[in-house]
Every structure is written in structure tokens, then in C-alpha cells.
């Protein structure tokens, strides 16, 4: 009976992230998804859209000020017969490794594209990351209530640029001010759009069949004729939906709508809950772990400091891979070889936290962390496993950080180490001096770090330029030659936040010369946590 219950709970789970270019409408669609999941009563509109209500999923001060999602938050809600775990990822111009790592914790992704602009740079980068694990992708063409590009052109661009086949499930009826709704190809019905219903769930009118006279009455002769022609073309020229190809990450079902107008979002949720995979198996260094295994396993993919300034706490986000978490259970923290009892794990509703009752494979739970948990840590019910594929990426931008008040050096170091463990930034301490160098994937991370040091650690810090162009983690199996390398290159060596030896290069030329000069040393662009 317990096994049956475990299976039934796991089969309900759908764990996905939303990926998009900034301003494609990701935070808005997150809101509307939560509205349909009854997780919120009324959707907040992102700041900058003429509203003083801040979006539910943007809860750090800096996010509230700027109207962007800086950290990943996790939201769980029921939808029809499924239980959905939605991981929200940063949607701003620069994003951090946090985003990459979040994508290791999901089983599918919803890609949001601004239908007026098509495929943009950030979407390309995020798709490359999903490709590493052949993640199934559902596509939502957003902002159809504005003037959009030709829908066939959009499908063609996604197929060409992102190397994924498209299978349209819905098709837009008109666009911009003339947007009338979508035709649901699978259900063979028109779903009509009403404006001014963005904050609540609409009672939509549906009309069955493309030749139904009611459709002509509703949208007019010309648009009905245009729709018939377009559908004939699109059904003839595009791919049919194929579940196997979708699960293999080779084909994406495509939906059209407007998140701001709260239209078409339920179609996406229907598709995700119907077709997206239940919790998938994960690789460890020794074997594959399957969701239905009775014993609990999970890995930490993110650490968030001070989610609640009242508590000054840190939460480790853990993806459960197999089995079941129940309050007070004992588990093995594999890296430190210690048995721990977890009685106060939490579940999330973007900043609102509740103590977790039972949680199952696919769920994300939060563990209170007093400095002992790191990104990539594995927890099990006894077995010594380490989940693989949770990466650190070499930063691309560097700054020296220094204090306005030199007496706060201890607090600065503490803050930087905590922020680096959380994945907000990387910290490097050169072997030859007391500098603190901060490395990031995107410029905004620097602003985030200074703002958080001030707000959470009461440290007033500023940046200076530093002669570092790139960094690589270094290692070697040849102890003697590695010692020789360390002696000769000491001025280019630093320790990162986890005390791993790193080569910091003033230029690409310098890095390439060192790689040639020391063939027995491995210079790594990524490091497994």
C-alpha cells in the first residue's frame, strides 16, 4: 500500500522552470500560472506596468525596486490532477550560474518568446543549457495582443536557431488590437479572447469546428477565411505532436496567447501536466537513481542567504530525486559523512514558507543551513552516492572589492563567502596578497552583491578594476610537476570560496601560453560541485 501511495504521489509531480529573454513576459506568465493553480487570488503586475503591486515571485528588495527576478524562487501548486513545482529563474539582462544550476533540478522547461521579437540572445544561451540534459521544452508565444511577427516565420526561426522541431497546438486568430483568440488545433475549437480580464481567470467562449457558422458571427467573414487558409497551411507544413520526440527534447509543442491578458496560459498548463515527464532518473557517480526507489535521495542545487531578514537565515534548496521526505527523518549528509535529523524543512510559495509535511520525488524542499551545506551536496538514507552534473562555471567578469571602512574586513569576508556558497558570485583570494576579487557571469551580479552586503551584513563596499580577464580551475595527477607549476605561477594563483586552486589570467594570451607551457596541468572551465 505504501509503495502504491509513493507511486501515485510521484506520478502527480511535474517540475519545470520558465526560461526566456528579459522582458519576454516570464514574470507575468509565472503570476498567471500561479493564478490558475489557485496559489494566489489576484495576479500582481510587475512594477513598471503602471501598478504598485509587486509580483509574488519577485521578493528581494532589489527585485522589487527594479522589477526583475534576481534569484530563483520555488512555488508549488495543484493544477487539475497534478502537483506542479515551478522554479522561477532570473529574467534580467545578466543572470548567474544560479540559472544554469536551476535547470539541473527540473524535468521540463517552458520557453516564453516575445512574439513581436522572436528568438533572442538569452533564450539561445538557456536552450544550450537545456540541451546538455535533453530537457523537454514547451513553447509559449507571448504578447499576441500586440503586433506580432508572422506566426509561421516564428516557428521557422525557433526550428532553425534553436534546433528543435515545432508542433503548433494552438494558432492565433488575428493579432494586436485585432487579436480574437486562438484556434486549438488538437481540440478542434476556437477559444475567444476578451480584453480587460488580466487579473482573473476568464470564462472563455469556445466554438467547436472551423466551419461552424458561429465562428463567422464571432470574428467576421474575412478573419474566418484567413484562419481557414492559415490552418490548412500550418497543418500541412508543420510537425504533428509526437510524445516520444517531445520527451527526447527534439520537438516542442507551441502555444500562442497573452500572459498579461491572461489568455492561453491554461492551454500551456494543460499541455505541461498532460505530456511533461514525471520525475526523471538522475545520474550519480556510481549508478542511476530512479524516482520510484523507496529510499530517499536528493541534491542541493542552490543556497539562498537571508530569505527572511527577520531570521538572518540561509536555506539550501534540495531537489528530491527518489523516495519520500517526512518530518524528523534521519538522512546521511554524504560529503561530510554525518547522519542528520531534518525536522524543519520548508516548502515554498515565493517567499512565503511553510513547514513541509511529506514531500516526494520531484519536490523541492528547503533545509535550514548553518554553513554546513554546499551546492552539489547529496543527502541519502544511508547509501554513499554523489549526484553529478551540478556545475560551477568560470566567471567572465572580474572586479576587486574593497571596504569604505577597513574595520569591517571580517564581515566582508564572511558575506562574500556566504554569497559565493549560495552561487550569487564567485570569490578569489590571490596567494600573493590580501586582495578579494569577485568574479561574475553578468554585470548585474556585481550590483546584487554590493546591495546585499549592505542590506544583510551592514558592509559598505566598492569595486575597482582588476587585471584579470579569465579564470580556470587547475589540477594535475603529476604531483612534482604541479608543485613546479605552482611555484612558477604563484602570482597568477588564487583560492576560490571553496579553497579550490584557480589560475587567474590577465589575458587570453597569457592563459593560452600557460596551457601550452604546462601540458600536465588541467585548466578547467567548469567545476563539478
UniProtKB/Swiss-Prot annotation:
Residues 11-280 form the tr-type G domain. The keyword Nucleotide-binding applies. It comes from the Bacteria. GTP binds at residues 20-27, 88-92, 142-145. GO terms for biological process: regulation of translational termination. GO terms for molecular function: GTP binding; GTPase activity; guanosine tetraphosphate binding; translation release factor activity, codon nonspecific; translation release factor activity, codon specific. The keyword Nucleotide-binding applies. Transmembrane segments: none annotated. Coiled coil: none annotated. InterPro entries: EF-G-like_DII (IPR053905), EFG_III/V (IPR035647), G_TR_CS (IPR031157), P-loop_NTPase (IPR027417), PrfC (IPR004548), RF3_C (IPR032090), RF3_dom_3_sf (IPR038467), RF3_GTP-bd (IPR041732). Its main location: cytoplasm. It is found in: Cytoplasm. One of its GO terms (cellular component) is cytosol. PANTHER family: PEPTIDE CHAIN RELEASE FACTOR RF3 (PTHR43556:SF2). Belongs to the TRAFAC class translation factor GTPase superfamily. Classic translation factor GTPase family. PrfC subfamily. Increases the formation of ribosomal termination complexes and stimulates activities of RF-1 and RF-2. It binds guanine nucleotides and has strong preference for UGA stop codons. It may interact directly with the ribosome. The stimulation of RF-1 and RF-2 is significantly reduced by GTP and GDP, but not by GMP. This is Peptide chain release factor 3. It comes from Pseudoalteromonas translucida (strain TAC 125).
Amino acid at each position: 500500500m505504501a509503495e502504491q501511495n509513493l507511486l501515485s504521489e510521484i506520478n502527480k509531480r511535474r517540475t519545470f522552470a520558465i526560461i526566456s529573454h528579459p522582458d519576454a513576459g516570464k514574470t507575468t506568465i509565472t503570476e498567471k500560472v500561479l493564478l490558475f493553480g489557485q496559489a494566489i487570488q489576484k495576479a500582481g503586475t510587475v512594477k513598471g506596468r503602471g501598478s504598485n503591486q509587486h509580483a509574488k515571485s519577485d521578493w528581494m528588495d532589489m527585485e522589487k525596486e527594479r522589477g526583475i527576478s534576481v534569484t530563483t524562487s520555488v512555488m508549488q501548486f495543484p493544477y487539475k490532477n497534478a502537483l506542479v513545482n515551478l522554479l522561477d529563474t532570473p529574467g534580467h539582462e545578466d543572470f548567474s550560474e544560479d540559472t544554469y544550476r536551476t535547470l539541473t533540478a527540473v524535468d521540463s522547461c517552458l520557453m516564453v518568446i516575445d512574439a513581436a521579437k522572436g528568438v533572442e540572445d538569452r533564450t539561445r544561451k538557456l536552450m544550450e543549457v537545456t540541451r546538455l540534459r535533453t530537457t523537454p521544452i514547451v513553447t509559449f508565444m507571448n504578447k499576441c495582443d500586440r503586433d506580432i511577427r508572422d506566426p509561421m516565420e516564428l516557428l521557422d526561426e525557433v526550428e532553425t536557431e534553436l534546433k528543435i522541431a515545432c508542433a503548433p497546438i494552438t494558432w492565433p486568430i488575428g493579432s494586436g488590437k485585432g487579436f480574437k483568440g486562438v484556434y486549438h488545433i488538437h481540440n478542434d475549437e476556437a477559444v475567444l479572447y476578451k480584453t480587460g480580464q488580466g487579473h482573473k481567470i476568464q470564462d472563455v467562449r469556445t466554438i467547436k469546428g472551423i466551419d461552424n457558422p458561429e465562428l463567422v458571427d464571432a470574428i467576421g467573414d474575412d478573419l474566418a477565411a484567413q484562419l481557414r487558409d492559415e490552418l490548412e497551411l500550418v497543418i500541412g507544413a508543420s510537425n504533428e505532436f509526437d510524445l516520444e520526440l517531445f520527451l527526447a527534447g527534439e520537438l516542442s509543442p507551441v502555444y500562442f496567447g497573452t500572459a498579461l491578458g491572461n489568455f492561453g496560459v491554461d492551454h500551456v498548463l494543460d499541455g505541461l501536466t498532460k505530456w511533461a515527464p514525471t520525475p526523471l532518473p538522475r545520474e550519480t557517480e556510481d549508478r542511476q537513481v530512479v524516482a520510484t526507489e523507496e529510499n530517499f535521495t536528493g541534491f542541493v542545487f542552490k543556497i539562498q542567504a537571508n530569505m527572511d531578514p527577520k531570521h538572518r537565515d540561509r536555506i539550501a534548496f534540495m531537489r528530491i530525486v527518489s523516495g519520500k521526505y517526512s518530518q524528523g527523518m534521519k538522512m546521511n549528509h554524504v560529503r561530510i559523512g554525518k547522519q542528520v535529523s531534518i525536522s524543519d524543512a520548508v516548502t515554498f510559495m515565493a517567499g512565503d514558507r511553510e513547514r513541509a509535511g511529506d514531500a516526494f520525488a520531484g519536490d523541492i524542499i528547503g533545509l535550514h543551513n548553518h554553513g554546513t551545506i554546499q551546492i552539489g551536496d547529496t543527502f541519502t538514507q544511508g547509501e554513499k552516492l554523489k549526484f553529478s552534473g551540478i556545475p560551477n562555471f568560470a566567471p567572465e567578469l572580474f572586479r576587486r572589492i574593497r571596504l569604505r571602512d577597513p574595520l569591517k574586513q571580517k564581515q566582508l569576508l564572511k558575506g562574500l563567502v556566504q554569497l559565493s556558497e549560495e552561487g550569487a558570485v564567485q570569490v578569489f583570494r590571490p596567494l600573493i596578497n590580501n586582495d578579494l576579487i569577485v568574479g561574475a557571469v553578468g554585470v548585474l551580479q556585481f550590483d546584487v552583491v554590493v546591495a546585499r552586503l549592505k542590506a544583510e551584513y551592514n558592509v559598505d563596499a566598492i569595486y575597482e578594476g582588476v587585471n584579470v580577464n579569465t579564470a580556470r580551475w587547475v589540477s594535475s595527477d603529476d604531483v612534482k610537476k604541479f608543485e613546479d607549476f605552482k611555484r612558477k605561477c604563484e602570482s597568477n594563483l588564487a583560492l576560490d570560496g571553496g579553497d579550490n586552486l584557480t589560475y587567474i589570467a590577465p589575458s587570453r594570451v597569457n592563459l593560452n601560453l600557460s596551457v601550452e607551457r604546462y601540458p600536465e596541468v588541467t585548466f578547467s572551465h567548469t567545476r563539478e560541485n
